[in-house]
Amino acid sequence: MKKNIFTLLILVGICLGMTSCELFGLSYAYSFKNEPGKDFDTLNCNAYEFIESRADNDLTLMYEAINRAGLKDLFEAEDYTYFILKNDQWDDYMSTAKYSCIQDIPVSELRTYILGYIVHGKYTSKDVTNPIYLESMNGVQIMRMYKTQTAPTSSQNLNSLVAGWVNPDGGVYQRGCITSNLVCTNGVVHILSSRLIIVV
């Protein structure tokens, strides 16, 4: 009897946890019928709380970078779209820039870099039927976003978002999102497949 009650409590806890940020898993949003992109259910947390909930998992360095740059308030502010980097993408950035850890990056550089991944307004894949160009929050990068409309492969989500910074020559070195349309209480989060790059 005790074993059955214990099992039932575990199952109830898992079900409740699935709606929280703490146990929310990043999933792939495939649509094989070229249907309009769909939003995930609104998460019961803001973008900062979502990242904080994964600080012990795949968003450790993103969480550290936001706090070191003093940008927590922006990730709690209303009406923004955030492109998020996982740990391996931060490792790639630090390796390229010759930093050994987040704490080595000058705060001003870190702020500029993170702000380049944020645009004002809430954009999901169904809001971007044609490519759009938006100024990033750092006032330097222009971001081009569009929705994938080709047949999916093992590494591509149909109707997911694709983004990139516009290079000085007008070209865009674009990156897909491994997860799109995570609608938080204050904006939209997209998880990039790799970091954005500008060619100078």
Where are these regions (language model features)?
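Extracellular/periplasmic catalytic domains that process cell-envelope and extracellular macromolecules
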Residues: 75-76, 135-138, 183-184
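Aromatic/histidine-rich interaction motifs
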Residues: 102-177, 198
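Short active-site loop/helix that positions an aromatic residue
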Residues: 89-103
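FKBP-type peptidyl-prolyl cis-trans isomerase
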Residues: 62, 83-93, 179-198
